[in-house]
């Protein structure tokens, strides 16, 4: 039995469920797969206990339990991430490689907004989850319509507080458990309503090839008589021969160069696109002018900075991290894309130390600039071993 071919006949979108523990994230995930399967005939129904017993994954040495399910709405194919534990969520959002295109925030109508509801919205803002749709769960257990209205108002205020459009965000009232029991009921209708909202509120993600060209430089060598070649994997966009690119990072000033040749697997290409491992021949560049850790990019699309705030997860001892806390002015290496840069951590006011297993927002200043933008991931390393993982939240300069 060969593997089924992945049919790319609908746009693809990465989403996940977020929200307070026991508000019904996993039940909703199961209800979505069952309802879409039973009502639209797409995908496969995945049982609650199969999602709940999420396998442990090790991503860059960090242990995270996550469940991945896929399903299809009328308009799109979705890959959906659900995590059983709160710590897993935080780790997944800060360290996970898969960027979410949007999230479904689950809030139990019986409890309203809770501590982790706030934390997940804040994290979404910090790590660059661009869109949130809300599912108010357990509405079958609330008899008072005024109470439902109050919870909805509370959610809208909270979203606005974290700079999401609270007034306009779709909020669907339903019951995941009732929909799971009978997808053809009015509660099943609510799941379809949720997906009409998700399909429209979360726009089609921009494909990597449509974004401006960027390639982190992994290696540099010179070919006598031809010039200097920079090699690496194209992160996004498309590059054509004889286009101008900019070399950004490490040095304060950037410079523009023309790409006179593109090579892949020893063959010459006219163009390279996201995902390709290439060598780019650069006109008039000395071997000493360019180094690993810089990026080639479409001119003017990315700048380099030294100072930024970041959302960071500090590995536990069991994950191979530190055994002891670190303090203000801690100076580790920050590994961005292809290179380590030394930097200084400034902890938030009133925070004296950071323990293994903590997640924390901190200010970081690097000793030399790196091409960066919000949401860029990095590892924190000490002597070559990873002790933390983070994402750029805001750029200071």
Curated annotation (Swiss-Prot):
Pfam families: GTP_EFTU, GTP_EFTU_D2, GTP_EFTU_D3
Region (G5): 175-177
Enzyme Commission number(s) from the entry: 3.6.5.3
Binding, Mg(2+): 26
Every tr-type G domain range: 10-206
UniProt keyword terms in alphabetical order: Cytoplasm, Elongation factor, GTP-binding, Hydrolase, Magnesium, Metal-binding, Nucleotide-binding, Protein biosynthesis
CDD domains: EF_Tu (cd01884), EFTU_II (cd03697), EFTU_III (cd03707)
Spans annotated as G4: 137-140
The organism's place on the tree of life at top rank: Bacteria
Function statement: GTP hydrolase that promotes the GTP-dependent binding of aminoacyl-tRNA to the A-site of ribosomes during protein biosynthesis.
Name of the protein this chain belongs to: Elongation factor Tu
Species annotation: Lachnoclostridium phytofermentans (strain ATCC 700394 / DSM 18823 / ISDg)
